[in-house]
Amino acid sequence: MKSSGSARATRRNAVSSSSAPAHAEPPARRAAKSARKLDGAAARPLAPTNAASAKPQGRTREDKDRPLFEDIRYLGRLLGDVVREQEGDAVFDVVETIRQTAVKFRREDDKAAAQTLEKMLRKLTPEQTVSVVRAFSYFSHLANIAEDRHHNRRRRIHALAGSAAQAGTVAYALDKLKQAGDASSKTIKQFFEGALIVPVLTAHPTEVQRKSILDAQHDIARLLAERDQPLTARELAHNEALLRARVTTLWQTRMLRDARLTVADEIENALSYYRATFLDELPALYADIEEALAEHGLRARVPAFFQMGSWIGGDRDGNPNVTAATLDEAISRQAAVIFEHYLEQVHKLGAELSVSNLLVGASDALKALAAASPDQSPHRVDEPYRRALIGVYTRLAASARVRLGEGTVPVRSAGRGAAPVRATPYADAEEFAADLRVLTDSLALHHGESLATPRLAPLMRAAEVFGFHLASIDLRQSSDIHEAVVAELLARGGVEADYAALPEADKLRVLLAALADPRPLRSPYLDYSDLAKSELGVLERAHAIRAQFGARAVRNYIISHTETVSDLVEVLLLQKETGLFEGTLGTPHANARNGLMVIPLFETIADLRNASDIMRAFFALPGVGELLAHQGHEQEVMLGYSDSNKDGGFLTSNWELYRAELALVDLFDERGIKLRLFHGRGGTVGRGGGPTYQAILSQPPGTVNGQIRLTEQGEVIASKFANPEIGRRNLETVVAATLEATLAPHSNAPKQLPAFEAAMQTLSDAAMASYRALVYETPGFTDYFFSSTPITEIAELNIGSRPASRKLQDPKNRKIEDLRAIPWGFSWGQCRLLLTGWYGFGSAVAAYLDGAPDAAERGKRVALLKKMNKTWPFFANLLSNMDMVLAKTDLAVASRYAQLVADKKLRKHVFERIVAEWHRTADALAEITGAHARLAANPLLARSIKNRFPYLDPLNHLQVELIKRHRAGDTNARLRRGIHLTINGIAAGLRNTG
């Protein structure tokens, strides 16, 4: 974070600029003066290093990554300038001294430096503390921007050099399938016709970024990318002035929210990613896919198989702030954003498609569309496309008006010469897309196909993908809430006095009888509890939304904590009571159909083990087959990674998910039903995080089958989708992996699979025993956790609209079982143990190997584990993720957090167990992989993590010091703010949070 006395001598340009010391003159003035000085000089730009002539071959990894580290140093210097300018030399010197001392401690293992660092941090005033924390936090953010830029840069270099397609691209997947003989045109065509891929955006309580910060970072990323282009000296100086201004904006912008985020805020945050990335990049991805298919001899327009989903505004599980009103707010804001996009694009098309029928013909359908337009201007009488588009625009505006109200979406005049009209609204988005297709077809028939490529084709694709709703909103609620509402309806209706107390068989009998009866349970003459009115109100609003915006707007209902068949049937009954269920269930000629698919969410280890039995019993119920037929013989099942991890640990969670998936595949194949799995993955490895590409490819054979939904958790949405180029790459990765996993499932079914699975079962049993012995069976562990991590401080942070825990208000009755899995994982990350991503593996491997009767057998078991790593993607991905987590852990830093535990005996007992298991795990991983250094297979990530530590360490040390003061009764507002700033900075530095 050194202050740059002069501007960086850029590697990308022949001319370098210089500037006076940062504190001597305002940056903008210095940049302007520099530009004037160099204006007229021989500032001929040189080709950037990524020009077409550049070849990636023959260069070392260090050479390839040098631009990344130059960018990090450059941004660090800019930040140093800003700190000195804004806070003065004294604060800058403190920050720089802490940085240098932390680097010395980290790189040289200098114990004296560690003691010096601790003394310095203890002496900081609350004001200095906040400045130091902000400086190190923003450095982490800027380093992330530089890394993202470098990923884009490297991809472009490969493309310019004509390198082979990279893993994670559709082109690579097609090449791989072709080589394996799995890529006939018919097979590929069938895949896309039957595919459904849906990333589902969620708002989780560990998303720590403010939108204002994200906006500034977006500008910094754009300006940094500009520096890869050939720039004149004046342009370079101007670029630096703008970069300096945006870094200054960051410094002068409040990093934390003053008030807890509302659901409305979460809705707006998510919508910002549509504007920045999805609206443009998703249609572009479709075009890329069709181009890749064409290169493989398949020229076809793929259907709208890739769509977007959302939980924001519909996820009520544990969040009383989500209601019918927030559901309404979510769909209204989503619709407003997509209508604004459509209207803007149609308006621009009207300006661009100046095609005259005096020069080229037009189809009869296009002429009819133009004739129906309200535009009667004599200046456009020969311009049928413009006239047609004015008609489309007025109908779009009317469509927005009837759905959202007058004035909700900005609308332009229909054009000069066109009187204000009240056009006929489109019945649905399909009708809008059909009009666009008329324009496209006419252009294609009259030598104008290229005119559709820049804007019309992406707009038509957007209409197919986003409809009038933008993203499908899932509803989610806990099964115990459904039971309470159903029990109330049955009791008030005189059907069953105490439904909740009934055994499962009797519950099903009562539910099926109610579903077979056309009469509703609800009466307008009876009063119901606030809970019942709220829950039924959400479903009633969903019914209205489907009528207003189309069935795709709300089509799924997730049932958290599904433990029995009645948990599913209860939601069918609630749909019946709110108009979402038609006909009667299980009666002849009843034509039963449910508007929302009921989707079980299996979360705990026990529930995962019971998943296939529950679904088998559900399918066997009278009338359910008819419901499935209405759903196209498809059924979705959601699997929870977070709670299963908290319940059974990292290894067992992954293994039980694997087993549950295979059991479900067998059942669904037996019943002739198509299975779609919905993966509830989080940001951390402990919650199913890690590289999406490898995660999908490591799924058990037959479990992907062209269809997949997966959560994009709030805390990693920014890192994946804030940058449009990286956003498109991440979206393509999901498509490529799904394509490979579907058409080449044998790659995850090695010859020795039965032996591998038997070994995994043994490992899982031992790992779960080890994990639960620590977390659930160690006396005092709950106290240790709450003392040694910032969990209570995280709960105070204004991060999300949902509370961190269901039952944490009373410290005397705190239980790990009651803590939500997300802040559980988040807290372990903050203290640099990341326990949820590795604990239990070392003990499991040790038990497996020690269980061998002799040395020869032990050798065979080691060989088997090594072969599992080399030939079984499931196991290899598991170890790769664990390797990454271990690289981010730091036992020395974690020991500082352990000091927060007042009970010395408890502290020593628990921490020593964790340390011993860490070493066992690291040793086991080394024995299996043969790599003793962390991330040996991913040197760029290894260097990235290593270079972050000197900036992360001070944040951790400061966090411990501030927590000590806070818990000792210091009520200084700056101290509390400092704690929350460290939480933000550490999360940014680790690049995955909850």
UniProtKB/Swiss-Prot annotation:
Region (Disordered): 1-66
Entries under PROSITE patterns matching the protein: PEPCASE_1 (PS00781), PEPCASE_2 (PS00393)
A GO BP annotation: oxaloacetate metabolic process
Keywords: Carbon dioxide fixation, Lyase, Magnesium
Cellular component, GO annotation: cytosol
Function: Forms oxaloacetate, a four-carbon dicarboxylic acid source for the tricarboxylic acid cycle.
Protein name, UniProt field: Phosphoenolpyruvate carboxylase
Organism: Burkholderia pseudomallei (strain 668)
Record lineage: Bacteria, Pseudomonadati, Pseudomonadota, Betaproteobacteria, Burkholderiales
